[in-house]
Amino acid sequence: MALFEDIQAVITEQLNVDAAQVTLEAEFVKDLGADSLDVVELIMALEEKFGIEIPDEQAEKIVNVGDVVKYIEDNKLA
């Protein structure tokens, strides 16, 4: 589950939340207190960390931590 832990680390740093709050079901806005700018900055940080690009239309569909994990698993080059 190293991927989740890497994603969790980025989220805790970007949103300044406790790691225990960052679960697969946690929604960025509702559960982690992010606003729309926070989410944009988080997506950018994840893109940089994992060397991927998340198009805007996909980013709009990412609402919780599990969505991020799935997107990165499906799109990260091995």
Curated annotation (Swiss-Prot):
Positions of post-translational O-(pantetheine 4'-phosphoryl)serine modification: 36
Record localization: Cytoplasm
A Pfam family this chain is assigned to: PP-binding
Annotated Carrier domain residues: 1-76
Membrane-traversing stretches: none
Keywords: Cytoplasm, Fatty acid biosynthesis, Fatty acid metabolism, Lipid biosynthesis, Lipid metabolism, Phosphopantetheine, Phosphoprotein
GO molecular function: acyl binding; acyl carrier activity
UniProt keyword Cytoplasm present: yes
SUPFAM superfamilies cross-referenced by the UniProt entry: ACP-like
Pathway entry: Lipid metabolism; fatty acid biosynthesis
Origin superkingdom: Bacteria
Reported modifications of this chain: 4'-phosphopantetheine is transferred from CoA to a specific serine of apo-ACP by AcpS. This modification is essential for activity because fatty acids are bound in thioester linkage to the sulfhydryl of the prosthetic group.
GO-annotated cellular components: cytosol; membrane
Chief place where the protein resides: cytoplasm
The UniProt record lists the keyword DNA-binding: no
One record GO biological process: lipid A biosynthetic process
Role, per record: Carrier of the growing fatty acid chain in fatty acid biosynthesis.
Protein family per UniProt: Belongs to the acyl carrier protein (ACP) family.
Protein name: Acyl carrier protein
